[in-house]
Amino acid sequence: MAGQPLRLDRGLVGLTLLAGASMSMGFIQLLAGPLENVANLSVQVLAVQTTAMAAPLVITLLLLLREGPALVGLGTRLVHRQPRALMRRWSYQAVRLIPTAVALLPYLLAAAMVSATLTKPELSSLTDLQFLAGNLSPGILVLSLLKTALFAGLVLWITLHQGRRARRLRLGGSAALSRAISLSIAMVLGLDLVWVLLLDPSVSGGGI
């Protein structure tokens, strides 16, 4: 529940592992055709890199589905509080939610790398797994960590604010939750798009 330390329970970790494995295998299938003449490890490396780039969106969605109802409910109880009280509550929740989001990233990437080695029988050794880990771009990893933390904080603010707004306008809990989820997804996707277009050198045309 909101207000209690969020633990990495088995269900949340399990969903993260499943998401990482599924994403990696999906990207490998997409890349295997166009890059069929490239060495297998190149395909796996690209798949893991792509998974790392998409990981913040997936982790944010998992946390939103898990914590959204409780956070919207918490927001409804802040309707008569001053804006400063809402900010204090956001800070308190951010201390537990943002580290949780960041902590899920290694699980997702580990599952992606393991599934990548299992897609090809010849890539099932520990050496190949270490190779995939070693070829994960530090820049992509840092960006994934930053975006995961940023998206988690943004979703936290949206859910609390929507709960507060719903209580003020006398909206139902389901309507508030639906709006919070829709707005959170739209904001995160939009921010990710702006990030890629403006800050990614490979897209914006800037130097590396």
Where are these regions (language model features)?
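Membrane-interfacial helix-loop-helix connectors in multipass membrane proteins
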Residues: 30-52, 110-149, 158-179, 202-208
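Selective transmembrane-helix segments that form parts of the transport pathway or gating/packing helices
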Residues: 13, 17, 67, 86-110, ...
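Hydrophobic alpha-helical transmembrane segments of multi-pass membrane transport/permease proteins
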Residues: 11-33, 184-198
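Hydrophobic core segments of alpha-helical transmembrane domains in multi-pass membrane transport
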Residues: 22-23, 112-113, 151-156, 160, ...
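Short cytoplasmic-facing helical segments at TM-TM junctions of multi-pass membrane proteins
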Residues: 71-91, 173
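Selective recognition of hydrophobic, aromatic-rich stretches within alpha-helical transmembrane segments
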Residues: 62, 66-67, 141-153
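Cytosolic juxtamembrane amphipathic/interface segments immediately preceding
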Residues: 1-12, 170
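Membrane-embedded or membrane-proximal helical elements that form or frame transporter/channel pores
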Residues: 4-8, 33-68
